[in-house]
Protein backbone atom coordinates (compact mmCIF):
# COMPACT_ATOMS: atom_id res chain seq x y z
CA UNK A 1 0.00 0.00 0.00
CA UNK A 2 2.81 2.43 0.81
CA UNK A 3 4.42 1.77 -2.60
CA UNK A 4 1.08 2.51 -4.28
CA UNK A 5 0.71 5.77 -2.35
CA UNK A 6 4.16 6.88 -3.54
CA UNK A 7 3.81 5.66 -7.14
CA UNK A 8 4.40 8.43 -9.70
CA UNK A 9 2.93 6.37 -12.55
CA UNK A 10 -0.27 4.98 -11.05
CA UNK A 11 -1.35 3.26 -14.27
CA UNK A 12 1.91 1.31 -14.61
CA UNK A 13 1.91 0.41 -10.91
CA UNK A 14 -1.66 -0.93 -11.01
CA UNK A 15 -1.13 -2.86 -14.24
CA UNK A 16 2.02 -4.46 -12.83
CA UNK A 17 0.67 -5.30 -9.37
CA UNK A 18 -3.07 -5.91 -9.71
CA UNK A 19 -5.29 -8.61 -11.15
CA UNK A 20 -7.56 -5.85 -12.48
CA UNK A 21 -6.24 -3.45 -15.15
CA UNK A 22 -6.01 0.28 -14.48
CA UNK A 23 -9.14 2.26 -15.35
CA UNK A 24 -8.40 5.93 -16.00
CA UNK A 25 -11.98 6.97 -16.72
CA UNK A 26 -13.58 9.77 -14.77
CA UNK A 27 -16.69 8.50 -12.97
CA UNK A 28 -19.68 10.04 -11.27
CA UNK A 29 -20.58 9.05 -7.73
CA UNK A 30 -23.40 6.84 -9.03
CA UNK A 31 -20.83 4.62 -10.81
CA UNK A 32 -18.94 3.83 -7.60
CA UNK A 33 -19.84 0.85 -5.37
CA UNK A 34 -22.52 2.04 -2.93
CA UNK A 35 -20.61 0.80 0.15
CA UNK A 36 -17.58 2.98 -0.60
CA UNK A 37 -18.97 5.73 -2.87
CA UNK A 38 -19.12 8.46 -0.22
CA UNK A 39 -15.60 7.81 1.04
CA UNK A 40 -14.02 7.71 -2.43
CA UNK A 41 -16.03 10.57 -3.90
CA UNK A 42 -15.15 12.92 -1.05
CA UNK A 43 -11.38 12.41 -1.42
CA UNK A 44 -9.17 15.20 -2.72
CA UNK A 45 -6.84 14.52 -5.65
CA UNK A 46 -4.10 12.18 -4.39
CA UNK A 47 -6.31 10.82 -1.60
CA UNK A 48 -6.65 7.09 -1.00
CA UNK A 49 -9.29 4.77 0.42
CA UNK A 50 -9.11 1.16 1.45
CA UNK A 51 -8.49 -1.63 1.41
CA UNK A 52 -12.13 -2.61 0.93
CA UNK A 53 -13.84 -5.68 -0.49
CA UNK A 54 -15.86 -5.41 -3.68
CA UNK A 55 -17.24 -8.69 -4.97
CA UNK A 56 -14.38 -11.20 -5.06
CA UNK A 57 -11.67 -8.53 -4.95
CA UNK A 58 -9.92 -6.49 -2.32
CA UNK A 59 -9.44 -2.97 -3.63
CA UNK A 60 -7.48 0.12 -2.72
CA UNK A 61 -8.46 3.30 -4.54
CA UNK A 62 -6.53 6.47 -5.28
CA UNK A 63 -8.14 9.59 -6.73
CA UNK A 64 -5.81 10.87 -9.45
CA UNK A 65 -8.09 13.61 -10.76
CA UNK A 66 -11.21 15.59 -9.90
CA UNK A 67 -13.14 17.73 -12.39
CA UNK A 68 -16.54 18.90 -13.54
CA UNK A 69 -17.89 17.15 -16.64
CA UNK A 70 -21.29 17.20 -18.31
CA UNK A 71 -23.72 14.36 -17.82
CA UNK A 72 -24.69 14.62 -21.51
CA UNK A 73 -23.53 16.30 -24.70
CA UNK A 74 -25.23 16.94 -28.03
CA UNK A 75 -22.76 16.37 -30.85
CA UNK A 76 -22.49 16.88 -34.61
CA UNK A 77 -19.84 15.23 -36.76
CA UNK A 78 -18.51 15.21 -40.31
CA UNK A 79 -16.26 12.25 -41.14
CA UNK A 80 -13.78 12.84 -43.97
CA UNK A 81 -12.26 9.48 -44.79
CA UNK A 82 -9.74 8.26 -47.37
CA UNK A 83 -8.47 5.19 -49.22
CA UNK A 84 -7.48 2.24 -47.06
CA UNK A 85 -9.51 3.12 -43.95
CA UNK A 86 -12.16 0.72 -42.59
CA UNK A 87 -14.77 3.09 -44.07
CA UNK A 88 -13.42 2.52 -47.61
CA UNK A 89 -15.57 -0.05 -49.42
CA UNK A 90 -13.15 -0.10 -52.35
CA UNK A 91 -14.69 2.95 -54.00
CA UNK A 92 -12.91 5.71 -52.06
CA UNK A 93 -10.74 7.88 -54.32
CA UNK A 94 -9.59 10.48 -51.77
CA UNK A 95 -6.01 10.21 -50.49
CA UNK A 96 -5.09 10.86 -46.86
CA UNK A 97 -3.53 14.20 -47.83
CA UNK A 98 -6.68 15.23 -49.70
CA UNK A 99 -8.85 14.18 -46.75
CA UNK A 100 -6.74 16.22 -44.34
CA UNK A 101 -6.91 19.29 -46.59
CA UNK A 102 -10.69 18.94 -46.97
CA UNK A 103 -11.16 18.51 -43.21
CA UNK A 104 -9.03 21.60 -42.52
CA UNK A 105 -11.06 23.58 -45.04
CA UNK A 106 -14.41 22.42 -43.63
CA UNK A 107 -13.42 23.13 -40.01
CA UNK A 108 -12.44 26.66 -41.04
CA UNK A 109 -15.87 27.22 -42.60
CA UNK A 110 -17.86 25.89 -39.62
CA UNK A 111 -15.71 27.75 -37.08
CA UNK A 112 -16.69 30.95 -38.91
CA UNK A 113 -20.35 29.93 -39.35
CA UNK A 114 -21.55 26.96 -37.29
CA UNK A 115 -24.93 27.28 -39.01
CA UNK A 116 -23.40 25.68 -42.11
CA UNK A 117 -22.46 22.47 -40.26
CA UNK A 118 -25.61 20.49 -41.18
CA UNK A 119 -25.43 21.46 -44.84
CA UNK A 120 -21.73 20.56 -45.09
CA UNK A 121 -22.27 17.28 -43.23
CA UNK A 122 -25.00 16.30 -45.66
CA UNK A 123 -22.67 17.00 -48.56
CA UNK A 124 -19.30 15.77 -47.30
CA UNK A 125 -19.59 13.21 -44.50
CA UNK A 126 -18.47 9.67 -45.23
CA UNK A 127 -20.52 8.35 -42.29
CA UNK A 128 -23.87 7.28 -43.80
CA UNK A 129 -25.49 7.01 -40.34
CA UNK A 130 -25.49 10.80 -39.93
CA UNK A 131 -25.51 12.08 -43.52
CA UNK A 132 -29.28 12.63 -43.68
CA UNK A 133 -29.30 14.15 -40.17
CA UNK A 134 -26.77 16.85 -41.04
CA UNK A 135 -24.14 15.13 -38.90
CA UNK A 136 -26.41 15.21 -35.82
CA UNK A 137 -25.33 12.40 -33.48
CA UNK A 138 -27.93 13.39 -30.90
CA UNK A 139 -27.49 13.37 -27.14
CA UNK A 140 -24.79 11.16 -25.63
CA UNK A 141 -24.79 10.39 -21.90
CA UNK A 142 -21.31 10.21 -20.38
CA UNK A 143 -22.02 6.87 -18.73
CA UNK A 144 -22.98 5.11 -21.96
CA UNK A 145 -21.67 7.30 -24.77
CA UNK A 146 -21.40 5.48 -28.08
CA UNK A 147 -18.49 7.65 -29.17
CA UNK A 148 -15.00 6.70 -30.26
CA UNK A 149 -12.50 7.36 -27.44
CA UNK A 150 -10.87 10.33 -29.18
CA UNK A 151 -14.24 11.96 -29.83
CA UNK A 152 -15.49 11.23 -26.30
CA UNK A 153 -12.36 12.83 -24.84
CA UNK A 154 -12.94 16.00 -26.87
CA UNK A 155 -16.67 16.45 -26.35
CA UNK A 156 -16.65 15.90 -22.58
CA UNK A 157 -13.69 18.22 -22.02
CA UNK A 158 -14.75 21.23 -24.08
CA UNK A 159 -17.44 23.89 -23.96
CA UNK A 160 -20.56 24.33 -26.07
CA UNK A 161 -19.66 25.59 -29.52
CA UNK A 162 -16.21 23.97 -29.56
CA UNK A 163 -15.24 22.60 -32.97
CA UNK A 164 -12.15 20.54 -33.73
CA UNK A 165 -10.68 18.07 -36.20
CA UNK A 166 -9.90 14.73 -34.59
CA UNK A 167 -7.91 12.12 -36.49
CA UNK A 168 -8.21 8.38 -35.96
CA UNK A 169 -8.16 5.16 -37.99
CA UNK A 170 -11.40 6.09 -39.80
CA UNK A 171 -10.16 9.46 -41.04
CA UNK A 172 -10.71 13.04 -39.94
CA UNK A 173 -13.72 13.81 -37.74
CA UNK A 174 -14.88 17.41 -37.61
CA UNK A 175 -16.68 17.44 -34.28
CA UNK A 176 -18.89 20.16 -32.82
CA UNK A 177 -20.13 20.25 -29.23
CA UNK A 178 -23.62 21.71 -29.69
CA UNK A 179 -24.89 21.56 -26.11
CA UNK A 180 -23.81 20.28 -22.70
CA UNK A 181 -26.05 19.57 -19.72
CA UNK A 182 -25.77 18.92 -16.01
CA UNK A 183 -22.14 19.70 -15.20
CA UNK A 184 -21.14 17.65 -12.17
CA UNK A 185 -18.18 16.42 -10.19
CA UNK A 186 -16.37 13.32 -11.38
CA UNK A 187 -13.31 11.54 -10.00
CA UNK A 188 -10.59 9.54 -11.69
Q: Which functions belong to the PLM regions below?
A:
Residues 1-4, 16-39, 61-111, 127-147, ...:
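Well-structured core secondary-structure elements of compact alpha/beta domains
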Residues 4-8, 110-114, 158:
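Short coil/turn helix-boundary motifs
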Residues 8-19, 117-126:
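Short, well-ordered alpha-helical segments enriched in acidic and aromatic residues
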Residues 40-44, 154-159:
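Soluble sensory domains of the PAS superfamily and closely related sensory modules
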Residues 43, 54, 112, 168:
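Acidic surface patches and DE-rich sequence motifs
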Residues 48-51, 162-165:
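PAS and PAS-like sensory modules
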Amino acid sequence: IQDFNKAQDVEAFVNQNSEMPYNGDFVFKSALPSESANQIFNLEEGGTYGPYKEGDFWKYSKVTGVKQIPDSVKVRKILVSYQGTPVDQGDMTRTQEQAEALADSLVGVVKNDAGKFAELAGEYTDDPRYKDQGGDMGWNRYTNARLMPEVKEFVYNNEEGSIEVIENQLGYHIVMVEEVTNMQKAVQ
